[in-house]
Amino acid sequence: MRRFVWVSLSVLALGCGSSTSGGSGTGGNGGGGGAAPQSLVNGLRVSEVSIYQGLKIPLEVEGVPVDPRPTPVVQGREALLRVFVQPNPDWQPREVIVRLELSNSQGLVGAQEIRRVVNGGSVEADFMSAFNFDVAATDIAPDTTYSVGIYEVEPSQTAPSPGSRFPETGVAWLGALDDGPQIKMVLVPVQWNADGSGRLQDVSEAQVEKLRQQMYKMYPVRKVDIRVREPLSWNQNVSAFGQGWGELLQTVLYWRQDDLKNNVASDDEYYYGMFNPSNSFFSYCQQGCVAGLSSGSVSPKDSFLRGSIGLGYPGEYTAGTFVHETGHAHGRLHAPCAPFGQIQSVDPAFPYGDGGIGTWGYDLLTHQLIDPGGASKDMMGYCDPTWISDYTYTALFNRIAAVNGVADVITLAPQKSWQTISIAADGSLAVGVPFRVRGTPDGEPREVEVTGPGGSSRTVTGYFYPYSHIPGGMVLIPEPQAGDRAVRIGGRHLAL
């Protein structure tokens, strides 16, 4: 949940993805016909090669490959590749050619060259001080290799400097990993009938595209697939401070389960219910509000929890809530950043105490670098502006890969019916919706006392899933038997 209280450059592309982020404003007439220049440069070396797919992923530093990588290179996802250069003390500024070659098991895929004057060393924050190549998604494959070299514009008899090419000979492995073809999202417009208005959300192509772009920029995916479902009619109140949110979330999750049963949804789809409980965001949230809700999904096999809800008012904040809540549905807890420190369910393993992003970010759509020392914080906190940390990015990659890659294994587990018991913020209990779950749930085990026929008592194990932003959650218990009359959880009694 969230709460409220380039410069275009000239580049020569040779049979590879076009480059729109790098190069020189005055140069751009590099080697022709795809052949590499003849003479490696003297007095200048490749100090670093990094690739950016939302975050910076260093590939080599001072001639040494980075292994292991801090975050994965995602197969089939477009990228910016930056070549950093460092001159020797006696370097005389002059024009050089930096060439990137990409290959695969079949040979050379293509090459790009950038030609411009080098006056000094590359600096991360100075975009134009590095040589920046856009790499097409199709050129980032499991068998992709690369090499970079700095060449003299004119043939030279001077011996090249160490480090003028990486690797010194041959090619280096790019190391792209696969997490599946896409992330699938289903928007569920909630027709708001609690006040008799029948109010619906903006699910126009333009608004859906805002959601898609926000998720694509941050999530480690090739593609974000979004479809819009038929509306869900809702007659109950959902208050700004949490009452009614859990009931609506469970209903959206139950609709997903029903759609699966009727073969109109797939198990790898995440549902997102959008609702407008007032005419405007301000009128609903003028004194603060809950903006979205999910249930913490511990394991990839908790497919029944692949859903969230959030406010659906037009604007950028809806997109921010969308990616935040979907992060919860992928098992992410909160990053430790919120106004006045008011935040629950903080991830104890989050590596940055201020909720920061940890490394340089890069917006693939606006072509802007995001400074980790700046204002941006991880999207799983409550602070704005947001980006994504390397910690969250890697965790999402692993979860998305599991969802896309282990479906055949998951279907081998038998399905059983489990009854949901809702726990409200005040600890009171209510009977929720039933879910079909494969295998044993992975929530927190809770002891549940069941009162059976004739007042008999037995103890069963329930599994608790907390809500992402409000107190409470839901406990899954084995389907009640005939004659079961009541349950007791944490000292609270509920008649069935």
Segments (PLM) and residue ranges:
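Ser/Thr-rich, Pro/Gly/Ala-heavy low-complexity intrinsically disordered linkers and tails
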Residues: 1-39
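Contiguous beta-strand segments within globular domains
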Residues: 46-97, 413-443
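Solvent-exposed serine/threonine-rich low-complexity stretches and specific carbohydrate-binding patches
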Residues: 106-126, 230-233, 456-470
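Short beta-strand elements
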Residues: 154-194, 493-496
